[in-house]
């Protein structure tokens, strides 16, 4: 498998997205058995969706194509090292590998600096820039109990 070919496609998608004005400079492709099954471009600004990063967009499309919520035996190629949000999505999707071209420091130099998010993760919830507050309810564990008791659940 020629990883460079798929990475070049991801970079091309990123450039096309910029030139079309659909979002930030990021592109991604997902490959299974040597063939591209899904492509994604960042379209945050045109969709008004802050989660519409190239990797997430590609993952959503690939899962629809496969009719599955995990990307077993797939490889994700992305134009840039994934941000923390995309990293989480990638781990949930479980591809067998990820290849990227540019580093997150390259993205930071272009105005896409996500280093603050990594710093926020290590802080106690109440000390984050956007404070998080837990409010316990008597029924706060009931969704998890319902999940444990649900006979037809698909574990993931």
From Swiss-Prot:
Binding residues annotated for Zn(2+), in chain numbering: 53, 83, 86
Pathway membership, UniProt: Purine metabolism; guanine degradation; xanthine from guanine: step 1/1
EC number: 3.5.4.3
Enzyme class: hydrolase
Catalytic reaction annotation: guanine + H2O + H(+) = xanthine + NH4(+)
Pfam families linked to this entry: dCMP_cyt_deam_1 (PF00383)
CDD domains per UniProt: nucleoside_deaminase (cd01285)
Annotated active site: 55
Keyword Ribonucleoprotein applies: no
Protein name, entry field: Guanine deaminase
Source organism (scientific name): Bacillus subtilis (strain 168)
Lineage: Bacteria, Bacillati, Bacillota, Bacilli, Bacillales
């Amino acid at each position: 498998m020629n990883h460079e070919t798929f990475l070049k496609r991801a970079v091309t998608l990123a450039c096309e997205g910029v030139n079309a004005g659909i979002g930030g400079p990021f592109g991604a492709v997902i490959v299974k058995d040597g063939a591209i099954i899904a492509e994604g471009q960042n379209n945050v600004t045109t969709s008004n969706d802050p989660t519409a990063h190239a990797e997430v967009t590609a993952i959503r499309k690939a899962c629809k194509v496969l009719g599955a919520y995990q990307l077993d035996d797939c490889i994700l190629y992305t134009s840039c090292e994934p941000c923390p949000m995309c990293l989480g999505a990638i781990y949930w999707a479980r591809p067998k590998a990820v290849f990227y071209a540019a580093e997150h420091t390259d993205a930071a130099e272009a105005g896409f600096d996500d280093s603050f998010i990594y710093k926020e993760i290590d802080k106690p919830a109440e000390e984050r820039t956007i404070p998080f507050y837990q409010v316990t309810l008597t029924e706060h564990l009931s969704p998890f109990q319902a999940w444990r008791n649900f006979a037809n659940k698909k574990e993931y």
